């Protein structure tokens, strides 16, 4: 008796060649609908699945493989006498191989103006049922969901007359990887359409491999880069950047680029951001990006070395010539003019990335792994909850207020405890990741290469004591923005008044860990 294979595929790459091989190996091929038509047109004899089920396709093809004659054939244990006797009694033949891939759900949800009805019709039911059944019974049944595995299976049959246990187990594992990914897309899409922002009892993310990385954060760590396969994720992200030049991105390059892009989204006016080790080392806004870059370089010409520089405007020849003078890992921008790209590409090891966009749309959750679990939260997209509250005797001037908002945007993206000192929409000093707030203040002040008279200071969380305000006052800081909310706010306000500092409360903090 010939072995039997069911073939029903949406992705028809390589299927004709593989089916011909199976026929050479003595397999009878059972098929459905479009696949049967395609194989027949290519000269391959197939058995209509309706001849096996002895039941017609119904409900516009929604029901065609969901039948005991199919699933009993797939699930029967071929060394179990009772199973074989049952098949014989019911006139059911065993099925030895299932070659199936699923309706294009992912491609459907990414189409513009797709309707929920279109999406629903592209949720496969029969396909997942067959491949899950075959995967469960992998000791006896071979299942293929990936065209890349056709050659492996064909070679083993040609060499050994059968597919090895190890390969069948490997292929079965791929089935559950495939169906879990498929179901995760459906779950997340339905949740999005329903505008359900609650945290689910079970949380899955449809991640698709984008790139194998040379190594992880350190050379002894293996790593990969995955993308989220959902259409409602912001397009302005590192995943959607186009690499125009340079070596492949490293794990750390990707992390730093992500930080740069997220910070850029805070600004509408021409802005330049320099990132090092996932923290901003300098940020500036100006009338054009030429001036913005000059301010960034002046702010911290040391830390920028070996860092990432990102812009929210087109990079021109003048900027590119300045960038070429120093060692940088990556330059990011929405556009590069021809001369600028030529200049940057003359640097062999410089990576040049083009942003897809900088628009803010719906986004996915912020997910952080911990040993044994994961923390899931909303992205910190809010800048200010309410209007600023002036709490000191002196109100900030219009210019101070502009600088305060600028500094507040930056401090939101600095590791806590975080302090940013700024003036003229340019960071003068950044206190990063200190274990107490006064150290963060002292760090930001000491790092500045400029006279801080008239500068402003932003703190990502409240001041627990007045010492931070005192240090700011002694350094010449004229205005402060902070969340407020400490039981000692009164002490900080009194200290600010003593130095004639204008201080405003935001009513919200921006911790970043």
UniProtKB/Swiss-Prot annotation:
| Involved pathway(s) | Purine metabolism; IMP biosynthesis via de novo pathway; 5-formamido-1-(5-phospho-D-ribosyl)imidazole-4-carboxamide from 5-amino-1-(5-phospho-D-ribosyl)imidazole-4-carboxamide (10-formyl THF route): step 1/1; Purine metabolism; IMP biosynthesis via de novo pathway; IMP from 5-formamido-1-(5-phospho-D-ribosyl)imidazole-4-carboxamide: step 1/1
Classification via CDD domains:
IMPCH
List, for all copies, the residue spans of the domain called MGS-like: 1-145
Sorted alphabetically, the Gene Ontology cellular component annotations on this record are: cytosol
Catalytic reaction annotation: (6R)-10-formyltetrahydrofolate + 5-amino-1-(5-phospho-beta-D-ribosyl)imidazole-4-carboxamide = 5-formamido-1-(5-phospho-D-ribosyl)imidazole-4-carboxamide + (6S)-5,6,7,8-tetrahydrofolate; IMP + H2O = 5-formamido-1-(5-phospho-D-ribosyl)imidazole-4-carboxamide
EC number, as in UniProt? 2.1.2.3, 3.5.4.10
Q: Which GO terms describe its molecular function?
A: IMP cyclohydrolase activity; phosphoribosylaminoimidazolecarboxamide formyltransferase activity
Checking Gene3D superfamilies in the record gives: 3.40.140.20, Methylglyoxal synthase-like domain
Which PROSITE patterns does UniProt cross-reference here? MGS
Q: Name one GO biological process term.
A: 'de novo' IMP biosynthetic process
Instruction: Name the family.
Output: Belongs to the PurH family.
The written remark on domains in the entry is: The IMP cyclohydrolase activity resides in the N-terminal region.
Name-wise, this protein is Bifunctional purine biosynthesis protein PurH
Q: Which organism is it from?
A: Caldicellulosiruptor bescii (strain ATCC BAA-1888 / DSM 6725 / KCTC 15123 / Z-1320) (Anaerocellum thermophilum)
């Amino acid at each position: 008796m010939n072995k039997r294979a069911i073939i029903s595929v949406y992705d028809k790459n390589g299927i004709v060649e593989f089916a011909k091989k199976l026929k050479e190996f003595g397999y009878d091929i059972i098929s459905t609908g479009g696949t049967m038509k395609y194989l027949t047109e290519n000269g391959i004899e197939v058995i209509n699945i309706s001849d096996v089920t002895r039941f017609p396709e119904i409900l516009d093809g929604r029901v065609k493989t969901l039948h005991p004659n199919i699933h009993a054939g797939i699930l029967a244990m071929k060394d179990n006498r009772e199973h074989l006797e049952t098949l014989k009694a019911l006139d059911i033949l065993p099925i030895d191989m299932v070659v199936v891939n699923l309706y294009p759900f992912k491609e459907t949800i990414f189409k513009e103006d797709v309707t929920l009805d279109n999406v629903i019709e592209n949720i496969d039911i029969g396909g997942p049922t067959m491949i899950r059944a075959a995967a469960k019974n992998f000791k006896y049944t071979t299942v293929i969901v990936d065209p890349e595995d056709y050659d492996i299976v064909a070679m083993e049959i040609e060499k050994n007359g059968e597919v090895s246990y190890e390969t069948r187990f490997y292929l079965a594992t791929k089935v559950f990887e495939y169906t879990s990914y498929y179901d995760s897309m459906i779950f997340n899409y339905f949740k999005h359409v329903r505008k359900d922002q609650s945290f689910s009892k079970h949380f899955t993310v449809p991640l698709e491999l984008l790139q194998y990385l040379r190594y992880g954060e350190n050379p002894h760590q293996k790593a990969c880069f995955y993308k989220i396969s959902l259409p409602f994720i912001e397009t302005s992200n590192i995943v959607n950047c186009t690499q125009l030049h340079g070596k492949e991105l490293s794990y750390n390059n990707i992390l730093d680029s992500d930080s740069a892009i997220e910070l850029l989204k805070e600004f509408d006016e021409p802005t330049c951001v320099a990132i090092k080790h996932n923290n901003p080392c300098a940020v500036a806004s100006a009338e054009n990006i030429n001036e913005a870059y000059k301010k960034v370089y002046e702010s911290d010409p040391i830390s920028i070395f070996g860092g990432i520089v990102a812009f929210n405007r087109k990079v021109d020849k003048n900027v590119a010539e300045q960038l070429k003078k120093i060692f940088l890992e990556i330059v990011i921008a929405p556009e590069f003019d021809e001369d600028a790209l030529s200049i940057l590409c003359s640097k062999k090891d410089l990576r040049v990335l083009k942003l897809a966009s900088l628009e803010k749309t719906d986004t996915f959750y912020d997910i952080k792994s911990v040993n044994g679990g994961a923390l899931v939260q909303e992205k910190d997209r809010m800048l200010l909850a309410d209007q600023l509250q002036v709490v000191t005797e002196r109100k900030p001037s219009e210019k101070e207020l502009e600088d305060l908002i600028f500094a507040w945007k930056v401090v939101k993206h600095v590791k806590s405890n975080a302090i940013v000192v700024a003036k003229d929409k340019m960071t003068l000093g950044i206190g990063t990741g200190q274990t107490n707030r006064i150290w963060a203040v002292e760090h930001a002040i000491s790092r500045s290469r400029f006279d801080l008279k008239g500068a402003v200071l932003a703190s990502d969380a409240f001041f627990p004591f007045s010492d931070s305000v005192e240090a700011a006052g002694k350094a010449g800081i004229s205005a402060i923005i902070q969340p407020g909310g400490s039981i000692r706010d009164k002490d900080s306000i009194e200290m600010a008044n003593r130095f004639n500092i204008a201080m405003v409360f935001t009513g919200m903090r921006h911790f970043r860990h």
